[in-house]
Amino acid sequence: MPAMTPAFRRADLTGFLRTYGAALILLLAAMLAWQPAQAQLRVDISGTGATQYPVAIADFAVDDTHGRALAEVIRADLTRTGQFRLINAADSGLNVDSQVAHDDWRAKGADFLAYGSITRGPDGRYDVRYRLADTVKKGQLDGVAFSGTEQELRRVAHQIADRIYEKITGVRGVFSTRIAYVLKRGSTYELQVADADGQNPQVALRSREPIISPSWSPDGSRLAYVSFESGKPVVYVHTLATSARIPVANFKGNNSAPAWSPDGSQLAVALTRDGLSQIYIVSAGGGSNMRRITRSPGIDTEPNFTPDGRSIIFTSDRSGGPQIYQTGLDGGDARRLTFNGGYNISPRISPDGSTLLYVARRDGAFRIASLNLSSGSETLLTDGRDDQSPSFAPNGMQVLYAAIQNGRSVLAGVSSDRRVRQTLSVLNGEIREPTWGPFTR
């Protein structure tokens, strides 16, 4: 079964669609309960950024156990970016009201110092107060208070790491965002949602057949995906908080490759209802509203809206081999975007609209590439043999994708400048089809 592989991996594209539609049927009953997953992702990191900011993260005072754990999450978040060099802050004795000895910390090599306090209130909730000092300018860069239950402290740590990252780099942090992916364990497939660091995985959907093409809504509350339980591929929209879902594309033939409009009201999808796969727009709330966008003699698939919502990027073989095109929502003439190589698929556009991300076949290997849309310059970001499903972080600084490592499917990440790489894997199972969720605050 050619599940989980791009639609353009075979030379006979029309034959692939016939095979794909016939093979991926009869989905067994899916369990839609929102429940904790049984395994955490393991993260391995290599490389460093071109610039590394020296920062000390002190254990948060008062509640030693929770304060140490809070600081460890913040340190781990910053370390994963490769952009920070951690300065030892063991036994600092700092609390949120401490006077910072800027010169002393500067002498230790720290340009920045994060510190704070955590206390448990009478209602059982924890109050977390944090400060960020600039030891060079000898001033306070940031200071804020949070409140949460014990179960919410990890989220609070991610939010603090986001603030540290943004105050120092000027770019919004993504540590409190989420990722979605498909985990295959034995004969079972699970659509899972986890924190950006791979922790706290939750099962959104479980089935005995493949789940494909998960796509986040702009507000992070819903996932669109393709399911086959009715005997044919159908696009569903799934509300994560309630596990409620509705079919939004249930037409004759294949319904596939959902992608959200920036306002969350519509989905671009690939349908074969009128013959070869073409691009359509349907309502994200269900109903009968549908509009055809492309009308080509080839196969058009893998649509994605541009950030301004005015056009769609998609894959098409109209020129022979699969390439990436852009067309307006009026369905006018499409403009070809990729010209390097004879095989480029799975387009994703950066949050600022400046960079195109895609899978490129180069020297027989499938690698993740980026294209500067202004200059036309292409960069190969990965060096694997079978890298797939690229997805930008919502700040555009990192890329998540599926890779093969030691014969198993894993999630991998690479910084947009190629300098920092990470791998997310599980002890039992294979993970694939990643998609990085949006900012939600």
UniProtKB/Swiss-Prot annotation:
Assembly, per entry: The Tol-Pal system is composed of five core proteins: the inner membrane proteins TolA, TolQ and TolR, the periplasmic protein TolB and the outer membrane protein Pal. They form a network linking the inner and outer membranes and the peptidoglycan layer.
Functional note: Part of the Tol-Pal system, which plays a role in outer membrane invagination during cell division and is important for maintaining outer membrane integrity.
Matches recorded under InterPro entries: 6-blade_b-propeller_TolB-like, PD40, Tol-Pal_TolB, TolB_N
Gene coding for it: tolB
A GO BP annotation: cell division
UniProt KW Flavoprotein keyword: no
Record Pfam families: PD40 (PF07676), TolB_N (PF04052)
Family of the protein in this entry: Belongs to the TolB family.
Entry GO terms, CC: periplasmic space
Protein name: Tol-Pal system protein TolB
Signal peptide: 1-39
Localization per Swiss-Prot or TrEMBL: Periplasm
Species for this entry: Bordetella parapertussis (strain 12822 / ATCC BAA-587 / NCTC 13253)
Record keywords, A-Z: Cell cycle, Cell division, Periplasm, Signal
